[in-house]
């Protein structure tokens, strides 16, 4: 869960991973 995946991101990043 780093943010490279919108469903698995813990933080809002360029990958779209939002908590």
Swiss-Prot record:
This is Fibrinogen alpha chain. Conversion of fibrinogen to fibrin is triggered by thrombin, which cleaves fibrinopeptides A and B from alpha and beta chains, and thus exposes the N-terminal polymerization sites responsible for the formation of the soft clot. The soft clot is converted into the hard clot by factor XIIIA which catalyzes the epsilon-(gamma-glutamyl)lysine cross-linking between gamma chains (stronger) and between alpha chains (weaker) of different monomers. Forms F13A-mediated cross-links between a glutamine and the epsilon-amino group of a lysine residue, forming fibronectin-fibrinogen heteropolymers. The keyword Metal-binding does not apply. The keyword Disulfide bond applies. One of its GO terms (cellular component) is extracellular region. Heterohexamer; disulfide linked. Contains 2 sets of 3 non-identical chains (alpha, beta and gamma). The 2 heterotrimers are in head to head conformation with the N-termini in a small central domain. It is found in: Secreted. GO terms for biological process: adaptive immune response; blood coagulation; innate immune response. A long coiled coil structure formed by 3 polypeptide chains connects the central nodule to the C-terminal domains (distal nodules). The long C-terminal ends of the alpha chains fold back, contributing a fourth strand to the coiled coil structure. Keywords: Adaptive immunity, Blood coagulation, Coiled coil, Disulfide bond, Hemostasis, Immunity, Innate immunity, Secreted. Cleaved by the protease thrombin to yield monomers which, together with fibrinogen beta (FGB) and fibrinogen gamma (FGG), polymerize to form an insoluble fibrin matrix. Fibrin has a major function in hemostasis as one of the primary components of blood clots. In addition, functions during the early stages of wound repair to stabilize the lesion and guide cell migration during re-epithelialization. Was originally thought to be essential for platelet aggregation, based on in vitro studies using anticoagulated blood.
